[in-house]
UniProtKB/Swiss-Prot annotation:
GO cellular component, one term: cytosolic small ribosomal subunit
Subunit structure: Part of the 30S ribosomal subunit. Forms a tight heterodimer with protein bS6.
Family statement drawn from the similarity comment of this UniProt entry: Belongs to the bacterial ribosomal protein bS18 family.
GO biological process: translation
Name the UniProt record assigns to this protein: Small ribosomal subunit protein bS18
Length: 91
């Protein structure tokens, strides 16, 4: 079966796909970070979901080396009460 062609189908190809996903890249590799610090709360909060869960690497694009450091840093920050365990513990 031949592909449909014509003016109508060209317009569809030119429209931006609403399900388009941006190419994932590791923020830490791009920034040249050696070690992720548990005291850097702004960075850690970017990788914690609204329900308090750590966002997986397959969604963020973080490399496994940095994902392990990120998990450890978030868990340390939680233990020291710098970051809440869940969204239920807001002050």
């Amino acid at each position: 079966m031949p592909r449909p062609t014509g003016k109508k189908f060209d317009k569809r190809r030119q429209q931006q796909n609403p399900l388009f996903k941006r190419k994932k890249f590791c923020r830490f590799t791009a920034a040249g970070v050696d070690h992720i610090d548990y005291k850097d709360l702004e960075t850690l909060k970017d990788f914690i979901g609204e329900n308090g869960k750590i966002t997986p690497a397959r969604l963020t694009g973080t490399k496994s080396h940095y994902q392990r450091q990120l998990d450890t840093a978030i868990k340390r920050a939680r233990f020291l009460a710098l970051v809440p365990y869940t969204d239920q513990h807001k002050a």
